[in-house]
Amino acid sequence: MKTINFLKHKNIILAISIVVVLAGIIYGIATDYVFDIDFKGGTRIKVDLNEEYVESDIKDIVSGITSKVPEIQTSSSGNNTITITTQTLSEDESSALIAALEAKYTNIGDPTIRNVQASYGKELFNTAIIAGIVSIVLLLVYVAVRFRTLGYAAAFSAVLGLIFDVCFLFAIYGIFKFPINSTFVAVLLTIVGYSINDTIIVYDRIRENRKLVTKSSDPKEVINQSITQTMKRTIITSITTLVAIGVVLIFALVKDQETLKQFSIPLSIGIAEGTFSSIFVATSIWYTLDRLIHKNKSAK
């Protein structure tokens, strides 16, 4: 198999990747990230009105019950189901709102009401951040121990690749305005696990190939050869995973399952990006750091 020079344009690829991710995050901050009630607290009422409605009428009904500004979300499947999200309502306010909807729309379905206190939402958000940090630290230790023969630059590069994955996911959520909630945490941890698995496969092949060459051999050739050898497996695994996620997405679109859509869409994008980062980002960073370390040692 002909060896592909994946590192030929590493600086350009890294620069473009960083610019795209930073642009997405800046856009998300400038236009406000959408935090779901899981993390900010609030009340969510989902109900099928079973007849045509005007969104402004729904807002008028809510404003007649409470001064809290609502967010009205319509169903993407074309039916008359609406989701009303506000700051936390009391039980009396929720009951009054349902009664007002029943008065205007006489054939509504059974409503689903969910309340999350703001303090609990903040606690959950902080816990999610801590869990993410702990996961990355443990992965750093694992990669450092397993690939210690490659040097600690390998472990550091793998973690930088994971940080890139996390930042990319934040960029996606900022651009497409997916709500940041408990599903976001599940997507994040899944992508991180998938990406580090791809990276470990490449690193493992690099370690094996380095045993077959002399110390004076160009590490760039070893890296390119290792990525080329693992490329087929990586692509097949990614495609298989994306097909499975695609089935989930189709089901979510047909059945109008909002949670599954919030999970499958960013996950499919993240899986593709995780494959990209394990091939181009982590290995490019590792090669650059490894050359800098050897250059400094030679200078001494």
Q: How should these model regions be labeled?
A:
Residues 1-300:
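A structural signal for conserved, well-ordered secondary-structure elements
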